[in-house]
Amino acid sequence: MEQRSFFIKTYGCQMNLRDSEIIAQILNNNGYVETSEIGGADLVLLNTCSIRAKAEQKVMSKLGELRRNKKINPRMQICVAGCVAQQEGKQIQAKMPHVDLVIGTQYIYAINELLERSRTEGPITATNLDDKYVIPQFIPETTGKEHEGEFRKFVTIMQGCNNFCTYCVVPYTRGREVSRSIKDIVEEITVLVKSGIKEITLLGQNVNSYAQTNTVTEDDTPATFSDLLRQVAAVEGLKRLRFTTSNPKDLSNDLMQCFKDLDVLCPQFHLPVQAGSNKVLKEMGRKYTVESYLDLVTQLRENCPEIAITTDIIVGFPGETDEEFEETMKMLETVRYHGSFSFKYSDRPGTKANELTNKVDESVKSARLARFQARQDEIGLERNQEYIGTTQEVLIEELRDGEIKGRMGTNHIVHAIGLTNKKPGDFLMAHVTAAGQHSLRGSIVEE
């Protein structure tokens, strides 16, 4: 088998990172070797994101650069994958004729066959979405070295979304919701844990709706995301379990109970609210209210008092008034999030919000975002200061010069000084003595 080299550049979310890992393993299994040198690679694959216009612009700019690389290295194949590929399809090759292959989000498992075809047939676009798509079984390689030095992994449990929020392209770029079987997921995680992985994060566009659209059990009995969590938590050797992301409308009492029942489930919940105004939420198509959201926050904290709640915020949605933005600021003050990801609204082609005419001025959006982020930083610092004087279990990520960098179960980063014989991937206790906006400082507790 002829050996070829490949280079993957990943844009966007954790789903894309996991997809890139899957693509890399498939390529490795078919004789490819990964390289860090993009210019000399036989294959350059851009795994793209279209959640905001800026991400698309970065991809097109990189494709322009690759035109020059391909002139120097005519053997190079260029592949565009991910959400930009799904959204733009043949338009990519019309604008960038040096692109050999455009594959949508349901075609990553066929990457090798499509590359072979493009070498003989010329440019190929594979982006048709199938409503009856089934995610193929995927078990990671386990020769013993694949995960050397790694201790944290993402595992995709479902793909697509059926919510059709008016600002979001995901249902159009990832297709309808489809869930992997519990058996496949547990088998993948078991293999990863046996190879040394300590922490697993389950991924889906809306994990709360896992198993709502297709059967995930061998005997076709109904199942829920909570059922999956309980089975994954039982995998021997798994130390920490997380998941992302969730839609509040599907958050069940049983899922909240899992934070009481499952020791490995980290006390962290990313619960996107997007806006603090019922009018804006309705325009966004979010299907919950401010009141129902706040009730969920209360219940989560009752079930798990130490839980750290984070969120997503969009400012400047079409028609958002000053008064409605103030309601979002009130939401921030009420919940006092440990952290948030906040963005200015960005028009996305094909979405309902894109057709709205009452757009908010860019300068107003910028001012609102700056104000929200400044207050979030203040609250984040105040939240972090609550940990001063406590002793926390930390999973070591880095170790250098008498200091460790690690992460708590709440996902807070901790820098702790002191001597230890432990290495990255091990756990230790750290006494927190100081707090910043985005991390904590402390000292290693001697055993």
Swiss-Prot record:
Outline the extent of the MTTase N-terminal domain.
Answer: 4-120
Q: Which cofactors go with this protein?
A: [4Fe-4S] cluster
Q: Binding positions for [4Fe-4S] cluster 2? A: C161, C165, C168
Residue positions binding [4Fe-4S] cluster 1? C13, C49, C83
Q: Which UniProt keywords apply?
A: 4Fe-4S, Cytoplasm, Iron, Iron-sulfur, Metal-binding, S-adenosyl-L-methionine, Transferase, tRNA processing
- List its EC numbers: 2.8.4.3
Q: Where is the protein localized? A: Cytoplasm
* Top-level taxon of the source organism: Bacteria
Chief place of localization:
cytoplasm
Q: Kindly state what the record says about how the cofactor is bound.
A: Binds 2 [4Fe-4S] clusters. One cluster is coordinated with 3 cysteines and an exchangeable S-adenosyl-L-methionine.
Output the Gene Ontology terms for molecular function.
4 iron, 4 sulfur cluster binding; metal ion binding; N6-isopentenyladenosine methylthiotransferase activity
Residue span, Radical SAM core domain: 147-382
Give the SMART domains listed for this entry. Answer: Elp3 (SM00729)
Spell out the coiled coil positions from the record: none
Q: Which GO terms describe its cellular component?
A: cytosol
Please tell me whether the keyword Metal-binding is annotated for this protein: yes
* Reaction(s) this enzyme catalyzes, per UniProt: N(6)-dimethylallyladenosine(37) in tRNA + (sulfur carrier)-SH + AH2 + 2 S-adenosyl-L-methionine = 2-methylsulfanyl-N(6)-dimethylallyladenosine(37) in tRNA + (sulfur carrier)-H + 5'-deoxyadenosine + L-methionine + A + S-adenosyl-L-homocysteine + 2 H(+)
Q: Subunit comment for this entry?
A: Monomer.
Which NCBIfam families does this one have?
Answer: miaB-methiolase, MiaB/RimO family radical SAM methylthiotransferase
What is its biological role? Catalyzes the methylthiolation of N6-(dimethylallyl)adenosine (i(6)A), leading to the formation of 2-methylthio-N6-(dimethylallyl)adenosine (ms(2)i(6)A) at position 37 in tRNAs that read codons beginning with uridine.
Q: Which family does it belong to?
A: Belongs to the methylthiotransferase family. MiaB subfamily.
Q: What is this protein called?
A: tRNA-2-methylthio-N(6)-dimethylallyladenosine synthase
Please give the organism: Desulfotalea psychrophila (strain LSv54 / DSM 12343)
Which taxonomic lineage does the organism of this UniProt entry have?
Answer: Bacteria, Pseudomonadati, Thermodesulfobacteriota, Desulfobulbia, Desulfobulbales
The gene it comes from is miaB
